[in-house]
């Protein structure tokens, strides 16, 4: 039987405890999990791609079947390159579903083998988003219960650099 390989794509700017929860759960469901960190040109990320990959590795590196890859371009092309079984997406709210449903159908039009798997977050993470976390951190609020310690430290370094 062939191995199941799922891609969990995102900008992860920064990775949150919600992301960590989904990857941890996915690592029990799939043989291999690829955390695919998008360059994210259109989002003007706070953290560089290298920083985001390092933060993901420090937060999830203890999971032996999880790897971390930066990527650029269409997700459907990356899906094919990685010979993936499916793409994993988290759904926090109905509004997420509408967007993800449309995206999955478009990707399936581009590649009929494209499959999307949706997971809802554990309840305590259902309201967390990287955008909210960045805003709280920018205003020097306490984000320690929403992100891994490595991210807290990365925000502290950004503040020291004048962010």
From Swiss-Prot:
Top-rank lineage group of the source organism: Bacteria
GO molecular function: ATP binding; pantetheine-phosphate adenylyltransferase activity
Keyword Lyase: no
Binding residues for ATP: 11-12, 19, 90-92, 100, 125-131
Enzyme class at the top of the EC tree: transferase
GO biological process: coenzyme A biosynthetic process
Entry keyword Magnesium: yes
Primary location recorded for the protein, binned into one broad class: cytoplasm
Catalytically driven reaction(s): (R)-4'-phosphopantetheine + ATP + H(+) = 3'-dephospho-CoA + diphosphate
SUPFAM superfamilies from the UniProt entry: Nucleotidylyl transferase
EC number: 2.7.7.3
Alphabetical UniProt keywords: ATP-binding, Coenzyme A biosynthesis, Cytoplasm, Magnesium, Nucleotide-binding, Nucleotidyltransferase, Transferase
Family the entry assigns: Belongs to the bacterial CoaD family.
Protein name from the UniProt record: Phosphopantetheine adenylyltransferase
């Amino acid at each position: 039987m062939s191995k199941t390989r799922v891609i969990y794509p995102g900008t992860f700017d920064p990775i949150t405890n919600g992301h960590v929860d989904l990857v941890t759960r996915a690592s029990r469901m799939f043989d291999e999990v690829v955390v695919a960190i998008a360059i994210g040109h259109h989002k003007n990320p706070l953290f560089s791609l290298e920083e985001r990959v390092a933060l993901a590795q420090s937060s999830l590196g203890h999971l032996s079947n999880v790897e971390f890859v930066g990527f650029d371009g269409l997700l459907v092309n990356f899906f094919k390159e990685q010979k993936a079984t499916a793409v994993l997406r988290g759904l926090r709210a109905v509004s997420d579903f509408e967007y993800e449903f449309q995206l999955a159908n478009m990707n399936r039009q581009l590649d009929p083998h494209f499959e999307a798997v949706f997971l809802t977050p554990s309840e305590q993470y259902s309201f967390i988003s990287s955008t909210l976390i960045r805003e709280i951190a920018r205003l020097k609020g306490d984000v320690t219960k929403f992100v891994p310690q490595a991210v807290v430290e990365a925000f502290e370094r950004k503040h020291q650099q004048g962010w």
